[in-house]
Amino acid sequence: MAQIDFRKKINWHRRYRSPQGVKTEHEILRIFESDRGRIINSPAIRRLQQKTQVFPLERNAAVRTRLTHSMEVQQVGRYIAKEILSRLKELKLLEAYGLDELTGPFESIVEMSCLMHDIGNPPFGHFGEAAINDWFRQRLHPEDAESQPLTDDRCSVAALRLRDGEEPLNELRRKIRQDLCHFEGNAQGIRLVHTLMRMNLTWAQVGGILKYTRPAWWRGETPETHHYLMKKPGYYLSEEAYIARLRKELNLALYSRFPLTWIMEAADDISYCVADLEDAVEKRIFTVEQLYHHLHEAWGQHEKGSLFSLVVENAWEKSRSNSLSRSTEDQFFMYLRVNTLNKLVPYAAQRFIDNLPAIFAGTFNHALLEDASECSDLLKLYKNVAVKHVFSHPDVEQLELQGYRVISGLLEIYRPLLSLSLSDFTELVEKERVKRFPIESRLFHKLSTRHRLAYVEAVSKLPSDSPEFPLWEYYYRCRLLQDYISGMTDLYAWDEYRRLMAVEQ
């Protein structure tokens, strides 16, 4: 196992800046303060205020959006980071681990990773993801790319259909089809930060949001040693070279994770579990009393002094005894949140320290709060009650189905841009309006300038005389559409769909 030295991981250099010499502690902290400013002032963060947490298109400002959720995750991440650093200081290990002059950057990277962790999520959350992937899967049929004979290939895009005698090109076709059918919010977050918004963050800060290490074009089983880390796609083919450079800059082995990402993940797990239940009470899906009984029933028999007793029962009893000063709802969730944090944050911090050799190497194949402990059981309790009584509620399911339809419908509306031939689409990009393509011209004008420029830049770097050019061009054209639609807020997607379907009120 390599020696633990965080100076080798907290890399404060940037992709688009020439290498700099040795910096003082204050100068390094200023570099990460610059990251904070870039992130907090970015449009991607502002858009989170109109993206779904659990309840799409919610008008009640007391119910969480992705932005308010991310701010809560940021606070919990800071708490865990400080707890880790405090414990390492008590153990006199800060200097040994190269952290004595990097405590500020350590905290800042965790905080900003937490704030950014959802920026790649499309409108309507996981149902938006599913809509994008299903729509592309129905047209590209990535499963047919493994089939024999090649005549069984149902891919509707001629450039991406497998052909006899073109094995090197066929392998690229397989990768592209697989990649486009695995849109994922975390992978889109990497693309946003690097390719679309050109935020030019430090290598360490970007490493903090690389939650999953599986390429989106991966086919087959994942290695048992990395099955958790590769649970979902973490980056796209379009960012392959950038991630390879990121791994080099952060001393990460293939499919390994940046150490501070485990803290961001734990902060997210702690935050959303309680928040989803609180939002459900705010939405009157159930009362606080009903929630307590759901939790009690799901946990089962317990003794005085058990974690359930110390966290949930304690919150319930205190909220009932102090009901004159504040509402029972407010009291209950205040105590539940405080009790949960007071138990889970120290536990997550100690798990991080206990497993630091594997975490530093990037190979710890678990979440900090997923083990056989009571703390893990408490998180599972919150999640299970939310799944059973919140996510399955008819109002929630109806909104999710509407969201799925909106995203599918928008993709269908913009499909003419994907149906154009390479030469016709190239003409449209160059002229912006082509008389014989009136619909396509108007659809193209609606695309964001940022996304169009990203497409143009990517295609301009390709050798136009290469047999791979038509494949890559179509890939980036699909990315253009995915970038545009996934970047919409819930409300904008809803309004855009209604406008283009001519059903605006």
From Swiss-Prot:
PROSITE patterns: HD. The keyword Magnesium applies. GO terms for biological process: dGTP catabolic process. dGTPase preferentially hydrolyzes dGTP over the other canonical NTPs. Homotetramer. Belongs to the dGTPase family. Type 1 subfamily. This is Deoxyguanosinetriphosphate triphosphohydrolase.
